[in-house]
């Protein structure tokens, strides 16, 4: 039977081989079941192991019979589909034969390849993936079975294929720990922005010496931010505080200057108004003197004319005579 199982991955197509596979009966393989109480009690390690290069048709009578035996070949032989199906059927009967309703005839049909894989096999694949996931979270669940002291090296390279596959997929602890050890050294120096800022500060000197007071006051905020690219945050904050102080000082000086100018303007206007008032007063006094002079003259003329009219009223040459 080992010679038949050592065939290549391609199944034979000759009628003789197909007839042999059809006559192959898996019902004669019985599995010895251990009671539940004995399965829960820790047992001693197995003393009898399956010899390499042979396929076990019946479970061993040792305490390891609760663990389904797997076919193991020499390292040079390639694992075939027959080995997968045999291990899958044996593991399925050991775990729970009534759970998926899988019969040996289904395994034979899947082996022949004339029909697609039945639904119970697909269900078993899901159950096996869940079983692998359970073993992933609990890496030592088989310690409760008898003969749990047997290591992976004693059982051979094909004893637990799913565990072997899982260990190949997972990275080794040394490789997982090496990035963590390299993390502190991944950033040996400051970032590129800090380096650029240090270079700009070292080449151009202090940022306060780069701009004059007039430039800081007259420069807009957007233009200042464009010139401050590459400097450190402390230098930018200090320069903006200086700019704010200069602008406040300039605003205060401007207000003071405006107040002084307004004061001078008001004083000049006051002086001019006082002078105008004095001029108006002088003009009023002059007009008052002229008024008085004209009044005196008018009175004199009135008195002199009355006397002349009284003396010439009877003569015919006077105007009043003809009237």
UniProtKB/Swiss-Prot annotation:
Q: Which UniProt keywords apply?
A: Activator, DNA-binding, Isopeptide bond, Nucleus, Proto-oncogene, Repressor, Transcription, Transcription regulation, Tumor suppressor, Ubl conjugation
Q: Name the Pfam families for this protein.
A: bZIP_Maf, Maf_N
- What are the BP-aspect GO terms? abducens nerve formation; brain segmentation; cornified envelope assembly; fat cell differentiation; gene expression; in utero embryonic development; inner ear morphogenesis; keratinocyte differentiation
Name the residue ranges with Basic and acidic residues bias: 34-43
Report biased composition (Low complexity) as residue ranges.
Answer: 54-76, 175-203
Q: Where in the cell is it found?
A: Nucleus
Q: What is its main location?
A: nucleus
Every copy of the bZIP domain together lies at 238-301
Tissues in which the UniProt entry reports expression: Expressed at low levels in a variety of tissues, including liver, muscle and spleen. Strongly expressed in hypertrophic chondrocytes of the femur epiphysis, while expression is very weak in immature proliferating chondrocytes (at protein level).
User: Which intervals of the chain are annotated as region Basic motif?
Assistant: 238-263
Renumbered to this chain, region (Leucine-zipper) spans 266-287
Q: Superkingdom of this entry's organism?
A: Eukaryota
Entry-linked InterPro entries: bZIP, bZIP_Maf, bZIP_sf, Maf_TF_N, TF_DNA-bd_sf, Transcription_factor_Maf_fam
GO cellular component entries: nucleus; RNA polymerase II transcription regulator complex; transcription regulator complex
Residue ranges of region Disordered? 34-78, 116-209
Q: How would you describe the post-translational modification of this protein?
A: Sumoylated. Sumoylation on Lys-32 and Lys-297 stimulates its transcriptional repression activity and promotes macrophage differentiation from myeloid progenitors.
Q: Ranges of Basic residues compositional bias? A: 129-143, 159-168
Locate residues linked as Glycyl lysine isopeptide (Lys-Gly) (interchain with G-Cter in SUMO): 32, 297
Q: Does the keyword Cytoplasm apply?
A: no
Care to name a GO molecular-function term for this sequence?
A: DNA-binding transcription activator activity, RNA polymerase II-specific
**Family assignment?**
Belongs to the bZIP family. Maf subfamily.
Summarize the protein's role.
Answer: Acts as a transcriptional activator or repressor. Plays a pivotal role in regulating lineage-specific hematopoiesis by repressing ETS1-mediated transcription of erythroid-specific genes in myeloid cells. Required for monocytic, macrophage, osteoclast, podocyte and islet beta cell differentiation. Involved in renal tubule survival and F4/80 maturation. Activates the insulin and glucagon promoters. Together with PAX6, transactivates weakly the glucagon gene promoter through the G1 element. SUMO modification controls its transcriptional activity and ability to specify macrophage fate.
For domains, the record's comment is: The leucine-zipper domain is involved in the interaction with LRPICD.
What PANTHER family does UniProt report for this protein, alphabetically?
A: TRANSCRIPTION FACTOR MAF, TRANSCRIPTION FACTOR MAFB
Q: How does it assemble?
A: Homodimer or heterodimer with other bHLH-Zip transcription factors. Forms homodimers and heterodimers with FOS, FOSB and FOSL2, but not with JUN proteins (JUN, JUNB and JUND). Binds DNA as a homodimer or a heterodimer. Interacts with the intracellular cytoplasmic domain of LRP1 (LRPICD); the interaction results in a moderate reduction of MAFB transcriptional potential. Interacts with PAX6; the interaction is direct. Interacts with ETS1 and LRP1.
Name-wise, this protein is Transcription factor MafB
Q: What is the lineage of its organism?
A: Eukaryota, Metazoa, Chordata, Craniata, Vertebrata
């Amino acid at each position: 039977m080992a010679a038949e199982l050592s065939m290549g991955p391609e199944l034979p197509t000759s009628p003789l081989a197909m007839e042999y596979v059809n006559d192959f009966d898996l019902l004669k393989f019985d599995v010895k079941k251990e009671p539940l109480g004995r399965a829960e009690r820790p047992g001693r390690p197995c003393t009898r192991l399956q010899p390499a290069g042979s396929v076990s048709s019946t479970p061993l009578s040792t305490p390891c019979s609760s663990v389904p035996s797997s076919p193991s070949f020499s390292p040079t032989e390639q694992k075939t589909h027959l080995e997968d199906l045999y291990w899958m059927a044996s593991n399925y009967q050991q775990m729970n034969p009534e759970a998926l309703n899988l019969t040996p005839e289904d395994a034979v049909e899947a082996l022949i390849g004339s029909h697609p894989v039945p639904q119970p096999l697909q269900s078993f694949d899901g159950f096996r993936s869940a079983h692998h996931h359970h073993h992933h979270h609990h890496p030592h669940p088989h310690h409760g079975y008898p003969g749990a002291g047997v290591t992976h090296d004693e059982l051979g390279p094909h004893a637990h294929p799913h565990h072997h596959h899982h260990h190949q997929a997972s990275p080794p602890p040394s490789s997982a720990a090496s990035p963590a050890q390299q993390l502190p050294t991944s950033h040996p120096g400051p970032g590129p922005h800090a380096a650029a800022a240090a270079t700009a500060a070292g080449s151009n000197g202090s940022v306060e010496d780069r701009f004059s007071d007039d430039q800081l006051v007259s420069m807009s905020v957007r233009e200042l931010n464009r010139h401050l690219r590459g400097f450190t945050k402390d230098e930018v904050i200090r320069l903006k505080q200086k700019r704010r102080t200069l602008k406040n000082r300039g605003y205060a000086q401007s207000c003071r200057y405006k107040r002084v100018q307004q004061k001078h303007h008001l004083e000049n206007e006051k002086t001019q108004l006082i002078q105008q008032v004095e001029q108006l007063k002088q003009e009023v006094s002059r007009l008052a003197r002229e008024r008085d002079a004209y009044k005196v003259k008018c009175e004199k003329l009135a008195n002199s004319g009355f006397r002349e009219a009284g003396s010439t009223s009877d003569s015919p040459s006077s105007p009043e005579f003809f009237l």
